[in-house]
C-alpha cells in the first residue's frame, strides 16, 4: 500500500488533484477547510459523497488542489478525485462507487457560441418586416 494516494478528477473546466493519507477525516481544499471553501451545503455534500457512501469519512486526511471553472464544476471534480483515491486504496469500494455512478467522468461541457447567433443555440430576434 502506498503512503500517499494521488488522484485527479475533472468536471467541466475544473481540475482537482487529491492527496489522500490515513488520518482523522480532515479535508482541506486549496489550503482551506472544506466548510470554508464550499460554503453551500449541497456542494459540500456533493464533494464528500464518495466518503459518506463508503463510510470512510473519518479514516483519511485529504488535501485537494482544485482550479478552473466555478463552484459546481469544482465540487464535481473533487468528488471524482476522492472516489478515484478510495478505489486506489480499496478495490472493494469500487463496486459501491460504480453503482452510485461516482467513478464516471461527466462528459458534459459548455457548448461553444456559434457565429450568426446570440449564444450557442439562441438566435437573434427575428423581424418579419
Curated annotation (Swiss-Prot):
UniProt name for this protein: Small ribosomal subunit protein uS9
GO MF, any single term: structural constituent of ribosome
Gene name of the encoded protein: rpsI
Gene Ontology CC entries for this record: cytoplasm; small ribosomal subunit
Keywords: Ribonucleoprotein, Ribosomal protein
Species this chain originates from: Pelodictyon phaeoclathratiforme (strain DSM 5477 / BU-1)
Family: Belongs to the universal ribosomal protein uS9 family.
Domain of life of the source: Bacteria
GO process terms (BP): translation
Residues passing through the membrane, by range: none
A family per Pfam: Ribosomal_S9
Amino acid at each position: 500500500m502506498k503512503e500517499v494516494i494521488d488522484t485527479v478528477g475533472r468536471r467541466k473546466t475544473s481540475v482537482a488533484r487529491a492527496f489522500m493519507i490515513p488520518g482523522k477525516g480532515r479535508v482541506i481544499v486549496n489550503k482551506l477547510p472544506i466548510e470554508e471553501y464550499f460554503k453551500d451545503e449541497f456542494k459540500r455534500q456533493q464533494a464528500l459523497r464518495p466518503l459518506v457512501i463508503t463510510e470512510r469519512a473519518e479514516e483519511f486526511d485529504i488535501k485537494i488542489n482544485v482550479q478552473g471553472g466555478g463552484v459546481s464544476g469544482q465540487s464535481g471534480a473533487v468528488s471524482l478525485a476522492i472516489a478515484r483515491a478510495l478505489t486506489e486504496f480499496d478495490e472493494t469500494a469500487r463496486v459501491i462507487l460504480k453503482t452510485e455512478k461516482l467513478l464516471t467522468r461527466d462528459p458534459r461541457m459548455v457548448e461553444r457560441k456559434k457565429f450568426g447567433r446570440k449564444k450557442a443555440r439562441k438566435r437573434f430576434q427575428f423581424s418579419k418586416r
